[in-house]
Curated annotation (Swiss-Prot):
PROSITE patterns: IG_LIKE
GO cellular component, one term: membrane
UniProt membrane topology term: Single-pass membrane protein
Residue positions with a glycan: N46, N91, N100, N120, N212, N354, N400, N429
UniProt KW keywords: Glycoprotein, Host cell membrane, Host membrane, Host-virus interaction, Immunoglobulin domain, Membrane, Secreted, Signal, Transmembrane, Transmembrane helix
TM spans (from-to): 466-492
Functional note: May play an immunoevasive role in the pathogenesis of Marek's disease. It is a candidate for causing the early-stage immunosuppression that occurs after MDHV infection.
Keyword RNA-binding appears in the UniProt entry: no
The organism of origin for this protein: Gallid herpesvirus 2 (strain bc-1)
Feature: compositional bias, Low complexity: 62-72
Signal peptide feature range: 1-27
Listed name of the protein: Envelope glycoprotein C homolog
Pfam families, per the entry: Marek_A
Origin organism lineage: Viruses, Duplodnaviria, Heunggongvirae, Peploviricota, Herviviricetes
Compartments reported by the entry: Secreted; Host cell membrane
Length: 501
C-alpha cells in the first residue's frame, strides 16, 4: 500500500528525477549486473572525475582551427539552427501534451553524417549537445563517449583467401594485416563547477577535442589522417548507470585521388590482336575508380572471357588497379589509338583523367640458312633498320668479329625495311656442328626470329666422292706396287740368263 501512495504523491516525473539523482544510497542499491549492457566491452563509468589521469577539455578550438574552420562553422550554425527549428516544430504537440513534464530526453545534433578527408590532412566535425534543463546537476549525470570503429577496404574474398593460403593474412605490417580494433577515443564528463574532463586519447595528438560551454558544442579533429582512420565515429551519451541514451554515427571517409594513370600497349606482330593495360596507381578507397575504354575515339568494350581487372593494396601508398582489353587486328589498317578514361568518385567529389597509347606493329621477317664454299650463309628479307644479326655455334654466341653482315637492298613489300646477308666460316673439324642465325632488336623473345642448321663434317657425311678418292688412291698404290714387283722379277730373271750364257 505504501508504494502506490508514494507514486501518486511524487508522480512519474518526480520518480524519474529521483532515479537520475546521484544518490549514493540509490546507486548502491542497484546491481550493475541487472542494468542494460553497454554497446562495447569497455565501461566508461570507470573513468570518473575522482579518478586519474584526466585532462580538462579545451573550451575553444585553437586559432588555427578557428581560421581553417570558418566555413565549417557557418555551415554548422545553419545546420544547428535548422535542426533546432525542426526539433521544436516536430515536438510542439508533444510539449503541449507534457506541459507539466519539465524533463526531456537529451539529444545530439551533428553538422554532418560523413566527413570526406584526404590522406595526411585533417578531418573535422561538430556536434551540439541538447540537454534540457541544461543545469550543472543535470550535466553531471551524463557521460559522452567518443568511439572509433574501423572499416577495412584492403581485402576481398579472393585475395584474402590467397593471403591465408600464403600465410600472410594477419601478419603485422603486411597488406592483409587485421584491421584496427574498435577503441574508446575519449570519455567526457562535466563536474558541477562546469569543467569538462576527458580521459587521455590512446593516440596522443592524433585527436583534438574541444567543447564550447556557451553553445554546448563539441568539436572533434582527426589529424594526419591515414588509411587506418577509415571508419566511423560513435558519439554515445550514457547516463550514470552506463546505459546508452543517444548514439550518433559520423563516417570518416579517407580519400586519395589517383596519383597517375598510364596505358601500356605492347608491340604486336601483324595480324595478332592488340592488347592494352590501364594502370591506375595509388588511390583510395578501392572501388572508387571507374575505367572505360576507347578505340580511335569510339567506345570499346572488354570481353569477359579474356579481359578483366584486378587490384591490390600497398601499405602507405593506396590501391592500384589494372584493367585490360583485347582488340582485333586486321593486319591491314594502321594501329589504333587506344585510350583509357578514369573517373574517381567519392561523395560529391569527381576527378577524371585519361591516357592514350598507340601500339607498334612489326612484320614477320623472312630468313633462310645454307652452307656454301666453307661458309654458313644467312639470307634475311624485310627487317627494320635497327635489326642486327647474331651467330651462334652450338648455341654459344660468337663475337661479331668472326662474321660479317651486309645490306643487300630494300624490301619491296614493306616501306623503310631492308634486306641483309650475313655469313660465318664453318668449322671443318670432322664433327657435326649446329649453326644458328638470330635476329636481334625485336621487342619479343630473343629467339622469336632465328634459323638453325647442322653442318656435318664427319667422314660418313662427306659423301661418295670421298670414298671414290680413297679407293682410287689405294688402287693406284696397289697397281704401282705390283708393277714394281713385276719389273723387279723381270730384271732378276734376265740377269740369271745372262750369267748362264
Amino acid at each position: 500500500m505504501l508504494t502506490p501512495r508514494v507514486l501518486r504523491a511524487l508522480g512519474w516525473t518526480g520518480l524519474f528525477f529521483l532515479l537520475l539523482s546521484p544518490s549514493n544510497v540509490l546507486g548502491a542499491s542497484l546491481s550493475r549486473d541487472l542494468e542494460t549492457p553497454p554497446f562495447l566491452s569497455f565501461d566508461p563509468s570507470n573513468i570518473s572525475i575522482n579518478g586519474a589521469p584526466l585532462t580538462e577539455v579545451p573550451h575553444a578550438p585553437s586559432t588555427e582551427s578557428v581560421s581553417t574552420n570558418s566555413e565549417s562553422t557557418n555551415e554548422h550554425t545553419i545546420t544547428e539552427t535548422t535542426g533546432k527549428n525542426a526539433y521544436i516544430h516536430n515536438n510542439a504537440s508533444t510539449d503541449k501534451q507534457n506541459a507539466n513534464d519539465t524533463h526531456k530526453m537529451p539529444n545530439i545534433l551533428c553538422d554532418t553524417e560523413e566527413v570526406f578527408v584526404f590522406l595526411n590532412e585533417t578531418g573535422r566535425f561538430v556536434c551540439t549537445l541538447k540537454v534540457d534543463p541544461p543545469s550543472d546537476s543535470e550535466w553531471s549525470n551524463f557521460v559522452l563517449d567518443l568511439i572509433f570503429n574501423p572499416i577495412e577496404y584492403h581485402a576481398n574474398e579472393k585475395n584474402v583467401e590467397a593471403a591465408r593460403i600464403a600465410g600472410l593474412y594477419g601478419v603485422p605490417g603486411s597488406d592483409y594485416a587485421y584491421p584496427r580494433q574498435s577503441e574508446l577515443i575519449s570519455s567526457i564528463r562535466r563536474d558541477p563547477q562546469g569543467t569538462f574532463w576527458t580521459s587521455p586519447s590512446p593516440h596522443g595528438n592524433k585527436y583534438f577535442i574541444w567543447i564550447n560551454k556557451t553553445t554546448n558544442t563539441m568539436g572533434v579533429e582527426i589529424r594526419n589522417v591515414d588509411y587506418a582512420d577509415n571508419g566511423y565515429m560513435q558519439v554515445i551519451m550514457r547516463d550514470h548507470f552506463n546505459r546508452p541514451l543517444i548514439d550518433k554515427h559520423i563516417y570518416i571517409r579517407v580519400c586519395q585521388r589517383p596519383a597517375s594513370v598510364d596505358v601500356l600497349a605492347p608491340p604486336v606482330l601483324s595480324g595478332e590482336n592488340y592488347k592494352a593495360s590501364c594502370i591506375v596507381r595509388h588511390f583510395y578507397p578501392p572501388g572508387s575508380v571507374y575505367v572505360s575504354w576507347r578505340q580511335n575515339g569510339n567506345i570499346a568494350t572488354p570481353r569477359k572471357d579474356r579481359d578483366g581487372s584486378f587490384w591490390w593494396f600497398e601499405s602507405g601508398r593506396g590501391a592500384t588497379l589494372v584493367s585490360t582489353i583485347t582488340l582485333g587486328n586486321s593486319g591491314i589498317d594502321f594501329p589504333p589509338k587506344i585510350s583509357c578514361l578514369v573517373a574517381w568518385k567519392q561523395g560529391d567529389m569527381i576527378s577524371t583523367t585519361n591516357a592514350t597509347a598507340i601500339p607498334t606493329v612489326y612484320h614477320h621477317p623472312r630468313l633462310s640458312l645454307a652452307f656454301k664454299d666453307g661458309y654458313a650463309i644467312c639470307t634475311i628479307e624485310c627487317v627494320p633498320s635497327e635489326i642486327t644479326v647474331r651467330w651462334l655455334v652450338h648455341d654459344e654466341a660468337q663475337p661479331n668479329t668472326t662474321y660479317n653482315t651486309v645490306v643487300t637492298g630494300l624490301c619491296r613489300t614493306i616501306d623503310r625495311h631492308r634486306n641483309l646477308l650475313s655469313r660465318i666460316p664453318v668449322w671443318d673439324n670432322w664433327t657435326k656442328t649446329k649453326y644458328t642465325c638470330r635476329l636481334i632488336g625485336y621487342p619479343f623473345d630473343e629467339d622469336k626470329f632465328q634459323d638453325s642448321e647442322y653442318y656435318d663434317a664427319t667422314p660418313s657425311a662427306r659423301g661418295t666422292p670421298m670414298v671414290i678418292t680413297v679407293t682410287a688412291v689405294l688402287g693406284l698404290a696397289v697397281i704401282l706396287g705390283m708393277g714394281i714387283i713385276m719389273t723387279a722379277l723381270c730384271l732378276y730373271n734376265s740377269t740369271r740368263k745372262n750369267i748362264r750364257l
